[in-house]
A protein has these predicted regions:
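Adenine nucleotide-associated cytosolic modules
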Residues: 1-240
Length: 240
């Protein structure tokens, strides 16, 4: 396992003093490889907290470019990087947040076959997309490789998060999509208030760290539903 430098020990001190993390946990984070699919609002929030927390390797996957309408909620991107690939814009910002993190980018829309090739090389996959087909492809390939998937969604003032570990007798994303159907609106059609993507993305980062360090109780088998308009949070048990 990779050892922490003195500078890293200082940087991550407030995490290391947590009994659930300690030096072993921080070193495990440094050894970790995570794939973030989608560098929009959720991906920006998720990736900055994973980078700041000291996840040693992040691969960013997206095929889109930065547009002006993104800047209201996609906090890693800036006016000076309009029309730049989102993965490259995010990489610049994340390297400024934490230069100790290795960041790779994939500026492409990968086929399901290509996803099947790369997913086994990661410890956790984070689904930060707003595309049902991509979500289902990630679910199938993560299930095949038995790699945990942390899925989040945000629209209007509402958010939802769940974790899929693919252990025996646990649900998959298919069960979730069957509950809500395939005709899911995007924020382009329905709108989204900026802070809700930050809330959901931050929880995704938290769940990814918990899954990787095997601490606490993650959202496997449960769907966390957040209503930002009323500030009510509820939980739904997912069918197996």
């Amino acid at each position: 396992m990779a050892e922490l430098s003195y500078e890293e020990e200082l940087r991550y001190n407030r995490q290391i003093i947590l009994k659930a993390v300690d030096f072993d946990g921080q070193e495990k984070l440094k050894d970790s490889r995570m794939l973030i699919v989608g560098l929009g609002g959720l991906g920006c929030a998720t990736s900055q907290y994973l980078a700041a927390a000291g996840v040693g390797h992040l691969t960013l996957l997206d095929f889109d470019t930065v547009s002006l309408s993104n800047l209201q909620r996609q906090v890693l991107h800036t006016d000076s990087r309009l029309n730049m690939p989102k993965v490259e814009s995010a990489k610049i910002a994340l390297q400024q947040i934490n230069p100790h993190v290795e960041i790779e980018t994939i500026n492409a829309q990968l086929s399901e076959e290509k996803l099947a090739e790369i997913i086994p090389h990661f410890d956790v996959i984070l689904d930060c997309t707003d595309n049902v087909d991509i979500r289902n492809a990630l679910d199938r390939r993560c299930e095949q490789a038995k790699i945990p998937l942390v899925s989040g969604a945000a629209i209007r003032l509402e958010g939802q998060i769940s974790v899929f570990t693919y252990e025996p007798n646990t649900p998959t994303y298919r069960q979730l999509s069957q509950l809500f159907g395939q005709n899911v609106l995007s924020c382009v059609e329905a709108g989204v208030l900026a802070p809700i993507v930050g809330i959901v993305g931050s929880i995704q980062a938290l769940e990814a760290i918990k899954v990787r360090l095997k601490i606490g109780s993650n959202l496997c088998g449960r769907l966390l539903l957040i209503d930002g308009l009323t500030m009510r949070v509820r939980e739904m048990k997912l069918p197996v």
